[in-house]
UniProtKB/Swiss-Prot annotation:
Alphabetized PANTHER family for the sequence: FLUORIDE EXPORT PROTEIN 1-RELATED
UniProt topology in membrane: Multi-pass membrane protein
Organism: Halalkalibacterium halodurans (strain ATCC BAA-125 / DSM 18197 / FERM 7344 / JCM 9153 / C-125)
Function: Fluoride-specific ion channel. Important for reducing fluoride concentration in the cell, thus reducing its toxicity.
Record-linked InterPro entries: FluC
Any GO BP annotation: cellular detoxification of fluoride
Record has Membrane as a keyword: yes
Keyword Transmembrane helix: yes
HAMAP family xref list: FluC
Gene Ontology cellular component annotations, sorted alphabetically: plasma membrane
Name of the featured protein: Fluoride-specific ion channel FluC 2
Length: 134
């Protein structure tokens, strides 16, 4: 039970931080008329989640930290629902731009998740060897 409470608190704190960053990014990009904020959030969040996933396979942290950063921070920062809403709104005015936006979100998100995963794998494996060699 105590572990569950730690995880819930970590998810709440991570979610508050992630959501706050998402709000700030959307506020900063709002005047562009294009959903750059959501695109950036989802690509950066995908990179970060890919990085953390790989890192946590090599360097195993406490479960509450994994959940706080993954479910909380990344979950609060990224947003599928806003991606969907932005796509529909963009489609109503600029159908081709909507297609580009969805493709960039999908392929950019997956590509950057893979990039983060591969980068963390190299860094974490090197770090683990250095620590083991010390």
């Amino acid at each position: 039970m105590r572990q569950t409470v730690k995880e819930i608190v970590a998810i709440g704190i991570g979610g508050a931080i992630g959501t706050s960053f998402r709000f700030l990014l959307n506020t900063w990009t709002l005047t562009t008329g294009y959903p750059y904020g959501t695109l950036i959030e989802n690509i950066v969040g995908s990179f970060l989640l890919g990085f953390l996933t790989s890192w946590f396979l090599v360097i195993v942290p406490k479960e509450w930290l994994k959940k706080g950063l993954g479910v909380g921070l990344c979950g609060g920062f990224t947003t599928m629902s806003t991606l969907a809403a932005d796509s529909v709104l963009l489609y109503s005015h600029h159908p081709f731009s909507s297609l580009i936006y969805v493709a960039a979100s999908l392929f950019g998100g997956i590509g950057f998740a893979l990039l983060g995963y591969l980068l963390a794998s190299k860094i974490a494996t090197r770090r683990k060897r250095e620590v083991a060699g010390s």
